[in-house]
A protein has these predicted regions:
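Active-site/ligand-binding surface loops and adjacent short beta/alpha elements
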Residues: 2, 86-88, 163-165, 173-250
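Extended, loop-rich substrate-binding clefts of extracytoplasmic carbohydrate-active enzymes
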Residues: 2-10, 89-146
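Acidic, contiguous internal or C-terminal segments within carbohydrate-active enzymes
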Residues: 30, 128-166, 170-172, 177
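Acidic/His-leaning functional-site neighborhoods
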Residues: 96-111, 216-288
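C-terminal or internal capping secondary-structure element at the end of a domain, subdomain, or sheet
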Residues: 141, 149-151, 296-307
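Intrinsically disordered, low-complexity Pro/Gly/Ser/Thr-rich segments with frequent PxxP/GP/PP motifs
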Residues: 288-297
């Protein structure tokens, strides 16, 4: 199968496209946080896509962005590390949300094309200039397109001379039907993370079985975090509709993607399946938080297959 890589203008940015001859494609903007603009299989878009540069910059619902150095919400936007308190800007109610990686200007390190796949590798180096996270690190993201499949590998290397707290995540919105009500969902064995009125964890978890088997979403509203409890190396989420079957997966294990956020936005046209290496507010509650030593790398993979 023939794969190719092309580059085109996209407003003030460039959009890079990896595609093959059967209509599989991933399209991203490295200069805007390596945000995924669209993902297609056999010509069918399965992502809530960005159609214009203006829509990308508006960034409604944080569609398809990478999340670092923490995913999800941070209580009051503050945390304490090695006796010093740091303050992020408040940008979600009384909390900070999703870190600061969404629009950083990444560099394309390399593009690799083979008979079986196309991969683009983007990186961004932080020299410690962020007031709330004054640590040096290198973030990397590899996106690989294969035959009816797409894989992401994130990496975060501590370039500083002290240990630093790290959490990673991704925020894709999938579209599998005109209405989310008509999608069938199956989730991995997991616990429901109980939250308070500020959408922050209470410290309690409950067993969750609503989508143990393929079940129509219907009128269910979801904006919930889950701790994946199954003992295996991979967790799987299935989305099925008249358009086909989307099989999402994420690596499990120590320092991998043991948490998952599932969100159905109010417009009810898509569903977000969000891998996280740590819990909501992990900089404060420490759940799943990785303290990365100098030169240590946190990495992990997730992806989708379509049939």
């Amino acid at each position: 199968m023939i794969f190719k890589h092309t580059v085109e203008p996209f407003g003030d940015f460039e959009k890079h496209t990896l595609e093959n001859e059967q209509g599989d494609a991933c399209i991203l903007t490295p200069q805007y946080g390596a945000c995924l603009l669209d993902l297609r299989f056999k010509g069918l878009s399965v992502l809530d896509a960005y159609k214009t540069p203006e829509e990308l910059v508006e960034n409604a619902w944080a569609k398809n962005i990478v999340l670092f150095p923490f995913p999800n919400r941070l209580r009051d936007g503050s945390y304490t590390h090695e006796g010093k308190t740091y303050q992020f800007d408040i940008n979600n109610g009384d909390n900070a949300i999703h870190g600061f990686g969404k629009n950083v200007p990444m560099t394309v390190k390399n593009v690799t094309i083979t008979d079986d796949a196309a991969t683009i590798h983007c990186i961004w180096q932080h020299e410690g200039s962020h007031k709330a996270y004054p640590f040096r690190f290198t973030f990397g993201i590899k996106m690989t397109l294969q035959d009816s499949a797409f894989e992401v590998e994130m990496s975060f290397q501590n370039d500083d001379n002290t240990s630093i707290p790290v959490g990673l995540g991704w925020h894709p919105y999938f579209i599998m039907s005109e209405r989310v009500e008509d999608i069938y969902l199956q989730m991995p064995e997991s616990q429901f993370i109980m939250i308070d009125e500020r959408m922050l964890p209470t410290g309690e978890k409950e067993e969750y079985h609503a989508f143990d088997t393929l079940t129509r979403i219907g009128e269910t509203n979801l904006d919930n975090g889950f701790f994946i409890t199954q003992e295996s190396k991979q967790a799987d989420v299935i989305l099925e509709s008249e358009r086909g079957r989307l099989h999402y997966w994420q690596e499990l294990g120590a320092k991998k993607w043991q948490f998952l956020q599932v969100f159905t936005p109010p417009h009810r046209k898509s569903i977000a399946i969000e891998p996280m290496t740590c819990n909501i507010d992990a900089f404060n509650n420490q759940e799943g938080l990785v303290m990365l030593e100098p030169n240590e790398v946190l990495n992990g993979k997730f992806g989708v297959r379509f049939s």
